[in-house]
Amino acid sequence: MLARSLKKYFPVLSISFCILAFTIFLPLKEVFPLTRTAEGIVSEVTDGDTIKLETKEGTKLKIRLYGLDAPESPKFNRKTGRINKPGQAFGKEAGDVLVSKILGKKVKVDVLGIDRYDRMVSIVWLGDRNINLEMVREGMAEAYKEYLRAPLRAQFLEAETEARISKRGIWSLSEYQRPSEFRKSQKIRG
């Protein structure tokens, strides 16, 4: 009876296994079939994980860096210039590091999806440098485990482990609060 059931489902199981194997070993665009690429100049760095990109056509795109969650930077009242929501340790530094890497520079983004705030969730490339991974490796952000998918998941987790062991950036703190937990405690949207 079991052998008959296995024979019946063998083609389905075989195809499922092949799909899984291809998913693990295919390039990014094959794994994320909706991946689109855009190029432009980084016109603004909002914080350690969000930028604005202006394409050569003049289109302005809001980009959320995929795979990382940077500490929250302070939020300022535009009229008064005063802080109306506090930031986290390394929040400002994470933004400053991202500014030094890409502000005013031409980058390519691989858009993997759209988040609930209508930002394009993307991998940001400066030449052959994966800026997202660099931010995690330097301890300026944690790997955003809740949203990581194969095949990139392993790279981001490895980069975070390297930063933790070396006590870089956020991992040098004696007490660290995840940005997602901080946002909940401060009622800040992500």
Predicted features along the sequence, with ranges:
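N-terminal Lys/Arg-rich, disordered targeting/topogenic segments
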Residues: 1-10
